Amino acid sequence: MTISSTEQEAKKVNVVVDRNPVSTSFEKWGQPGHFSRTLAKGPKTTTWIWNLHADAHDFDSHTSSLEDISRKIFSAHFGQLSIIFLWISGMHFHGARFSNYSAWLSNPTTVKPSAQVVWPIVGQEILNGDVGGGFQGVQVTSGFFQIWRAEGITSEVELYWCAVAGLLMSGLMIFAGWFHYHKAAPKLEWFQNAESMLNHHLSGLLGLGCLSWAGHQIHVGLPINKLLDAGVAPQEIPLPHEFLMNRDLMAQLYPSFNKGLIPFFSLNWSEYSDFLTFKGGLNPVTGGLWLSDTAHHHLALAVLFIVAGHMYRTNWGIGHSMKEILEAHKGPFTGEGHKGLYEILITSWHSQLAINLAMMGSLSIIVAHHMYAMPAYPFIATDYPTQLSIFTHHMWIGGFCICGAAAHAGIFMVRDYNPAQNYNNLLDRVIRHRDAIISHLNWICIFLGFHSFGLYIHNDTMRALGRTQDMFSDTAIQLKPVFAQWVQNIHTIAPGNTTPNALATASYAFGGDVISVGNKVAMMPISLGTADFMVHHIHAFTIHVTVLILLKGVLFSRNSRLIPDKANLGFRFPCDGPGRGGTCQSSAWDSVFLGLFWMYNCISVVIFHFSWKMQSDVWGTVQNDGTVTHITGGNFAQSSITINGWLRDFLWAEASQVIQSYGSALSAYGLIFLGAHFIWAFSLMFLFSGRGYWQELIESIVWAHNKLHFAPAIQPRALSITQGRAVGLAHYLLGGIGTTWAFFLARIISVG
């Protein structure tokens, strides 16, 4: 049923709830598998425990009521928030109880951040290294110290208060999750009111969120950081509430505070330019962005988002209607355009989740790149272990979110997509063009793979033959990234025209000066050459292959020439039944499974490239005469142009710290390096095995048990094909990420 414009204006926001819809029953929750009739009967075979884990959070399988599913998801979100608050509370508690935060705050260039002390059990206190400031502990690389400094936290007592607040919020969230499922559960129409949700999320979460951060920075963060930058001891700085209550105190640091709100209401906003700045570049004392620039930035964002949160039509009959916008969105070659998408988005939470995961994943990757190019917090740029850790962290998070987007897009296509409601709209047209899309993607993957890898093979061969003049390199056959160099140059000279009042470029990665703090490079121009051109094409290759696998899984998730009735088989199925050989591993789930391996390949190349490039061309020490000595002495340009160079000069050379870490404070990384290799190798046992082999093995073991009259009541079963692949994938990724983590940190803590 379509709703006309006049009817839509009458779609009022009505907060409607059902009172006491579900009783609170610990007895019910105590029964494993209570959400499924089959599982509730208890285990007959060992498959039961696997199905219990697989289906516990698959709310679609518990009920067909969209309202009940929506309530469960809503309630689960509060549980997630509770865990996040508990984690944040724990981080602040560690900072308050087990850290050298005060020592670091007084001397952030030589004291290393530590907020973890290992108990002395059988010699484990060796892990507590001397991090400076008379403190023995484990060096941490989360960036929390730098965030606390930017917030204006000057003592451990304040961290205790933050920890207590986190605990209280955690408890409140658990209560809210229970309350909104068991006591006052929203009706389906509340969940489906897209306009109201957009208004509240844009204005409330993003708008007021930015405004509160800007307000905190202006009233607390800026004055405290200004005093810290000037060398005032933390214990002598007034407490945050004194800056809030005492305008004279603020006016000593920022004179415009004397004028109060008069410049605001008289539109004379430039009066506030002493604390809302547009300087550009980095603060030379801290090596981080100017906090007055970031306060200005968040204030501007707050205005934009609060305005954006008034754009959608709810009770007042003015503003946009999402349905109208989507249905009007069509061009001469796009058929019905976005008709039908509104109905999809308010009835399929998998479709919403897929879009949100793709967006958040991409955003996380963008954040990873901004955090080194424009370091946001004081002294984070010269803390190389933290810089490497947060880059790697945001890259992995982005990769996982994007793969999750493909997973939920596949689930949407199988469970929620209705072909009858999507005739000739853009989604239908993409599905009908899928052969062209996938075959083109396949062609570009082959092209990129052969050409990018081929450049390396050529270079390896030429170097082995001693024909260095025939190699692709900056000193022989040049393949300069001319477009990237042009972009860098534009960004270096643009601020002079676009922002004439800015003091410096947006990021020194594009060009400009070397910014050093405590004789360490915080940021400097990143020169690009043949080596970067080559590895960027490897990035293009691995990204396109990942997209090919994931997109193929989504577009062919309902049917294919091989299996026309895929939609009936579900999101994950091992094969198309007996007697149809060659149909295994073709479900949408299997595409996500394969896509995750390529995501791992892809992100690994990115973080290896970043780690080596920064050590070679950016990070290092600055002598008094201004000369820069890089950690690996600029070897990236000549070594990374061969496969052998990556193996010998990056992986092998930089693994020496983790391999030789035994007997030092870094020895845990040596053990993790070893253990994670084992976890990775263990995964291969699941990935390369046949199910029948294990089933036969189990049956002979059961025979032996029967012979001795202690056969188990629950019948043992081999893992299904899908379960085995899931276990293999989990250990492959866990082992790979653990290995990389230990390799990176042992290296960079030693040399950084």
Curated annotation (Swiss-Prot):
Chlorophyll a' binds at residue 677. It is a multi-pass membrane protein. SUPFAM superfamilies: Photosystem I subunits PsaA/PsaB (SSF81558). GO terms for cellular component: chloroplast thylakoid membrane; photosystem I. [4Fe-4S] cluster binds at residues 575, 584. The chain crosses the membrane at residues 73-96, 159-182, 198-222, 294-312, 349-372, 388-414, 436-458, 533-551, 591-612, 666-688, 726-746. It is an enzyme of class 1 (oxidoreductase). Keywords: 4Fe-4S, Chlorophyll, Chloroplast, Chromophore, Electron transport, Iron, Iron-sulfur, Magnesium, Membrane, Metal-binding, Oxidoreductase, Photosynthesis, Photosystem I, Plastid, Thylakoid, Transmembrane, Transmembrane helix, Transport. Phylloquinone binds at residue 694. It catalyses: reduced [plastocyanin] + hnu + oxidized [2Fe-2S]-[ferredoxin] = oxidized [plastocyanin] + reduced [2Fe-2S]-[ferredoxin]. This is Photosystem I P700 chlorophyll a apoprotein A1. It comes from Guillardia theta.
